[in-house]
């Protein structure tokens, strides 16, 4: 949430608002059992451009409200069925691509180099590097303490994924990611005073401090509808609605593929939920929300059984920001990086590549094109490239 807010150059609390609304309001109305919604990295470029064109964040929030109305209309018109036509190979490629991006993006954080905001998935980064050059650049800024915390977190996550751990009555109630974070905090405290190992504050979770009602009010922004007579305003609102809806439909299709129970989500209901969520975000200063594949896959991998897990996640996020900011500020980014890298490995297993290859070149090419284009651009461009390749094969087979 915070990393995306930083990448969008908006108040940090705007990301928190989006995470809370996405986790509670959207989840309540959602047509998916496991989808988790929140601010999306894929909308970063649109947010930056839109704020620049409209001249203020408040005017942009008004566009988010109207975008939410458009999404509700799309849901009523049953536009959610579009997601059913996305080729399976492209969905698999999207998941594998996200997994690789997660791994590449989190390696610098694991080593204690945090120039690129946590949560930013764009190829071209805010610090002027790209996803690959960052890996070379970080070598000069390695933090030994961060590496130790990251490796310990990895060890905990690997052990927590073993059958003996999952079958034990006591251990099975202790989620691996939670233990990794707890041990990360303890090691961070233990390293204090040791110059070589001590973790600098810039390598720790950074939350906005809300100490009073006045602080809360200062972090809330409200929409300015004075631009409704401007054609740019409506173009931005419509663009937001379409892109956010496409990301959501892609996310829902991906979640259904990951769902161990193979539930089929109601995509039209999901568009309605996203619309309601974006209207709420726009009215109190939150970034636009979509279904977020990384959050959703982490939700499934953590053993979620119902919508309640997403609601609890968002509630804890809100409580933590309001009541426990000092405790959360002790969490090392390297612990979180280890958790996300493990999620990435689960999304991009070698078996997925072998499976797509066995299905033949007509399945493998859209899959691998989706992965490659995603790595050097973004999710939507990768999916569009994969769909185009899949369509070419369909036309070729029917000539």
Residue ranges of model-derived segments:
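Transmembrane helical cores of multi-pass ion-transport proteins
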Residues: 1-398
